[in-house]
Swiss-Prot record:
Function, in words: Acts as a regulatory subunit of the 26 proteasome which is involved in the ATP-dependent degradation of ubiquitinated proteins.
Lineage: Eukaryota, Viridiplantae, Streptophyta, Embryophyta, Tracheophyta
GO molecular function, one term: enzyme regulator activity
One GO term describing the cellular component: nucleus
Repeat (PC) residue spans along the chain: 412-447, 452-485, 487-521, 522-555, 557-590, 591-626, 627-659, 661-695, 696-736, 739-771
Keyword Repeat among UniProt keywords: yes
Record-listed Phosphoserine modification sites: S889
Superkingdom of source: Eukaryota
UniProt family annotation: Belongs to the proteasome subunit S1 family.
SUPFAM superfamilies assigned: ARM repeat (SSF48371)
Protein name: 26S proteasome non-ATPase regulatory subunit 1 homolog B
Complex and partners: Component of the 19S regulatory particle (RP/PA700) base subcomplex of the 26S proteasome. The 26S proteasome is composed of a core protease (CP), known as the 20S proteasome, capped at one or both ends by the 19S regulatory particle (RP/PA700). The RP/PA700 complex is composed of at least 17 different subunits in two subcomplexes, the base and the lid, which form the portions proximal and distal to the 20S proteolytic core, respectively.
Pfam families attached to this UniProt entry: HEAT_2, PC_rep, RPN2_C, RPN2_N
């Protein structure tokens, strides 16, 4: 109470000058309590307080009191550095558990200071001394967090301060270690900017996981993939595959599918090759495995497995354990090679194809034949719309129209088949046989269709080119025609994506050095595709040639190729990025923007964002500025909500190139999300005054809205109508019309069963998808590169698999209204001669007669009112019957309207599950199958709880659904084609497509 009556600290301050130590101690003790109120007055005596702290004759406690008082005064004065310095001197009197602004502020300052010093100590070779008192404060704070059960806070501080020992302590002491580890993995991906340090954190997490009684092998293998340690993954898979427990084998298959989702092909091949072959087995066992694998459709993986297993002399004693391991190993290798998932995806897209051919027919009819840009755009849209479905009905039905494509349009038309048949690994070459170079170069066919066919082969085998690489190399070597070289280079780059094959590199380099502009551009891009993410020294060789050549096309191809080589290298690419962004040639600087985007792709790194924003507003070249803004989309796709906010001002720029870049940046980073802010930003750009800005905005809007239904966002329906209006408008400029046609294809991509996804479920970059969108964005200069968007397509499917990797039928539930996620309704033909329903004409004489009859009926009813009840009832029923006859149709309509929509939907495996639907997916309680991991989509291994009951399988070899759904009046014409296609088994050897008969130009 006495303290509340004090009006000045003057008396206590005077006591500080007293000679007796006990008086000084008394003064300090009371000033500490009053400092919050009287700090302005106390601040005049700071020198005295400081001298007391420095006086060695004082005992430790008194000096610490003086330090704490000085710290608080400096805090109120805003001198945080001095305040922290004296707080360190206060020792244990600085109580980290106190709940006050002073403590919170200084703790934040201390942690920041400590984190900076720790980072500097690691990053620089110099020895950085850290005040042990600062270390003590941070450690006290960490210990307090762990003691209080604030484990996430402790982990955040430990990661920021690079205290991995404290991080491990926080994880181990937490109540839910598995949940804490998952949180820590997410934090390391989201907030740890430095690649090397992130790897240290992940390595620690792997060690903690492995010490657990029941390790989470799914998470361990994901961490090992981030660390690029294939041997660790192979060891875990071998252990699970050799286990006697069937569930462990299912877990191994699930891990393999999860790794394949990340599309890191070189890593997967390394894991596959490290899996040890079974020990010597009898011939009978080998035959059994081969029979089993033939049923599993993993032909390429199986052949390798059979080759690797040497044929021994017949052993009389069969080792059943090894036989089981051999069978499981074959399945695992088939999954890791990607063939199993590709085959299942192909069958799913084929059997669930819901593409609307009437949309394409409308586009075709509205496009003027002499407008080659829109003609080609229609071919692109068809390929994208049917990507991976193997349905080429539209092309077959319009051969005359298609044959009008000449030169590069012919190249694109043929290459489009590669997108339609993407993943058809077994029959890819036979499908393209009619268009491929026959008997070496100049075999008599059109070089444009031959080049397009080689490009198509690359698209079919993208990232899985083992079986086609040699053929593409031979085709490249045996021709000197630049168009064929162009197609062969692109195809080879796709087939050998990220393999860094020296022989292929030399073949492509020899094409580059011919200095042909057309072939050289493709060669530059192809080199980048081949060397994706290798950060190789060859980049400097490519850069040197880019400076030597005079062809802009070659420089641009090389600039993009160099950018591809530094994919995912983060700070390791800074030297090359600096070199490219400072170059005098704007095309090299343009490549530097892509290098910056790809090196930091998906990291949301602040340094990269700052650099890109700087170039977006300061570079003298419009191309560089446009690309700098576009590149933001690649850096930010892991945090799509940020992109519209960051580029919102740029989308209102006076420069149309910057506006275009802003549109595509949003399209890339928010693809498939249906994000409301993204749509709001793009809407005004779709009606921009500049044609190419409208084009970019329409394409970006389609990318954002893919797999979003009109029921979940009404703007989707409005956008579809806007596209139709632009396409049908004869006065619309070509650029906008092309954008609208492409947008129509992207909206309904892959038979309306795919979305664009750049991150896998485990937050790993999908390499192929990111590279695909990067090269797709080059269509500004070269339209055939539009097809690269197909690499970013990811099926929106739940595909449950049993132990035999077959798809059993079982039901699960979507706890949401079916209309929210249903397919778009098929378009209908608008008939002009539909008779409008008009009111019936009534003559005046008829009206008078009806009125008179009604009046007589009323009088008669009154007269008979006293009559018997039966007669009354009959009259009433007759009247009711008459009324019901008149309003029969109306009543039926009302009944239909009244019926409420179901609040859930039963789905059958395999089912279409769009990203926004995943949170509503629930399994039935009495289900026969239980998933190995709770995943609402993708490939999910199922444990059979009733293995003795017979199974009903889905996705059989010959899907019963029609390959090309007929729409409206086209049904009769398509029936025969559809029946033929549906009867054809995907795995059977199909007849090659009919050759397109092009009219000679």
């Amino acid at each position: 109470m006495a303290a509340a009556m004090v009006s000045s600290a003057g008396g206590l301050l005077a006591m500080l000058n007293e000679p007796h130590p006990s008086l000084k101690l008394h003064a300090l003790s009371y000033l500490i309590r009053l400092v919050d109120q009287f700090w302005p007055e106390i601040s005049t005596s700071v020198p005295i307080i400081e001298s007391l702290y420095e006086d060695e004759e004082f005992d430790q406690h008194q000096r610490q009191l003086a330090a704490l008082l000085a710290s608080k005064v400096f805090y109120y004065l805003g001198e945080l550095n001095d305040s922290l310095s004296y707080a360190l001197g206060a020792g244990s009197l600085f109580d980290v558990s106190e709940d006050s602004d002073y403590i919170h502020t200084l703790l934040s300052k201390a942690i920041d200071e400590y984190a900076i010093l720790r980072s500097k100590a690691v990053e620089s070779s110099e020895v950085v001394e850290i005040d042990p008192r600062l270390v003590a404060i941070v450690e006290r704070m960490l210990d307090k967090c762990i003691t209080d059960g604030k484990y996430q806070q402790a982990m955040g501080i430990a990661i920021e301060c690079r205290r991995l020992d404290k991080l491990e302590e926080a994880i181990i002491k937490s109540e839910n270690v598995q949940g804490t580890l998952s949180y820590c993995i997410n934090v390391s991906h989201s907030f740890v900017n430095q690649r090397e340090y992130r790897h240290e954190v992940l390595r620690l997490l792997v060690n903690v996981y492995q010490k657990l009684a029941s390790p989470d092998y799914l998470s361990i293998c994901q961490c090992l993939m981030f660390l690029d340690e294939p041997q660790g993954v192979a060891s875990i898979l071998e252990k699970l595959l050799r286990s006697e427990n069937k569930d462990d084998a299912l877990l191994a298959f699930q891990i393999s599918f999860d790794l394949v989702q990340n599309e890191h092909q070189a890593f997967l091949m390394s894991v596959r090759d490290r899996l040890p072959a079974p020990k010597t087995r009898p011939v009978e066992a080998i035959q059994a495995v081969e029979t089993s694998t033939a049923q599993n459709e993993n032909t390429a993986g199986d052949v390798q497995m059979a080759d690797e297993t040497p044929s021994q002399t017949i052993v009389h004693e069969t080792d059943p354990v090894d036989a089981v391991y051999a069978e499981r190993l074959t399945k695992a290798k088939g999954i890791l090679s990607g063939e199993t998932s590709i085959q299942l995806t192909l069958q799913f897209l084929y059997s669930h194809n819901k593409s609307d051919l009437l949309i394409l027919k409308t586009i075709k009819q509205s496009v003027e034949m002499r407008n080659s840009v829109c003609h080609s755009a229609t071919i692109y849209a068809n390929a994208i719309m049917h990507a991976g479905t193997t349905v080429d009905t539209f092309l077959r039905e319009n051969l005359d129209w298609l044959s009008r494509a000449t030169n590069w349009a012919k190249f694109s038309a043929t290459a489009g088949l590669g997108v339609i048949h993407r993943g058809h690994l077994q029959q890819g070459r036979s499908l393209m046989a009619p268009y491929l170079p026959q008997g070496g170069a100049g075999g008599g066919g059109s070089p444009y269709s031959e080049g397009g066919a080689l490009y198509a082969l690359g698209l079919i085998h993208a990232n899985h080119g083992e079986g086609i690489k040699q053929f593409l190399r031979d085709s490249l070597r045996s021709t000197s025609v630049e168009v064929i070289q162009h197609g062969a280079c692109l195809g080879l780059g796709l087939a050998a994506l990220g393999t860094a094959d020296e022989d292929i590199y030399d073949d492509i380099k020899s094409v580059l050095y011919t200095d042909s502009a057309v072939a050289g551009e493709a060669a530059g891009i192809s080199m980048g595709l081949l060397l994706v993410g290798t950060a190789t020294d060859k980049a400097s060789e490519m850069l040197a040639y880019a400076h030597e050549t005079q062809h802009e096309k070659i420089i641009r191809g090389l600039a993009l190729g160099i950018a591809l080589t530094v994919y995912g290298r983060e700070e390791g690419a800074d030297t090359l990025i600096e070199q490219m962004t400072r170059d005098q040639d704007p095309i090299i600087r343009y490549g530097g923007m892509y290098a910056l985007a790809l090196a930091y792709s998906g990291t949301a790194n602040n340094k990269a964002i700052r650099q890109l924003l700087h170039f977006a507003v300061s570079d003298v070249s419009d191309d560089v500025r446009r690309t700098a803004v576009l590149a933001l989309g690649f850096v930010l796709y892991s945090d799509p909500e940020q992109t519209p906010r960051i580029v919102s001002l740029l989308s209102e720029s006076y420069n149309p190139h910057v506006r275009y870049g802003a549109a595509l940046a949003v399209g890339i980073s928010c693809a498939g999300t249906g994000l409301s802010e993204a749509i709001s930003l793009l809407e005004p750009l779709t009606s921009d005054v500049v044609d190419f800005v409208r084009q970019g905005a329409l394409i970006a809007m389609a990318m954002v809205m893919v797999q979003i239904s009109e029921a979940s966002d009404s703007r989707v329906g409005a956008f579809r109508r806007q596209l139709e209006k632009i396409i049908l408008d004869k006065h619309e400029d070509t650029m906008s019309k092309m954008g609208a046609i492409l947008a129509s294809g992207i909206l309904d991509a892959g038979g309306r069963n795919v979305t664009i996804r750049l991150l896998s479920k485990t937050k790993h970059d999908k390499v192929t998808a990111v590279i695909g969108l990067t090269v797709f964005s080059q269509f500004w200069y070269w339209y055939p590169l539009i097809y690269f968007i197909s690499l970013a397509f990811s099926p929106t499917a739940f595909i449950g698999l049993n132990y035999d990797l077959k798809v059993p039928k079982f039901e699960f539930m979507s706890h949401a209204k079916p209309s929210l996620f249903e397919y778009p309704k098929p378009t209908t033909v608008a008939t002009a001669n539909t008779a409008a329903k008009l009111p019936t004409a009534v003559l005046s004489t008829s009206a008078k007669a009806k009125a008179k009859a009604k009046k007589e009926a009323e009088q008669k009813a009154k007269a008979e009112n006293s009559g018997n009840e039966a007669g009354k009832a009959n009259a009433a029923s007759d009247e009711k019957e008459a009324e019901s006859m008149q309003v029969d149709s109306t009543a039926t309509t009302v009944e239909k309207k009244v019926e409420p929509e179901a609040t859930f939907e039963i789905l059958v495996n395999p089912a279409r599950v769009v990203p926004s639907q995943e949170k509503y997916i629930k399994l039935m309680e009495d289900s026969r199958y239980v998933p190995m991991k709770l995943a609402p989509s993708g490939f999910v291994l199922l444990r059979d709880l009733r293995p003795h009951e017979p199974e009903v399988l889905s996705l059989t070899d010959a899907p019963t659904s029609t390959a090309s759904p007929a729409v409206g009046a086209e049904a009769a014409g398509q029936a025969q084609q559809a029946a033929t296609t549906s009867a054809m088994a995907i795995d059977d050897e199909p007849q090659p497509p009919q050759a397109f008969e092009y009219a000679s130009p």
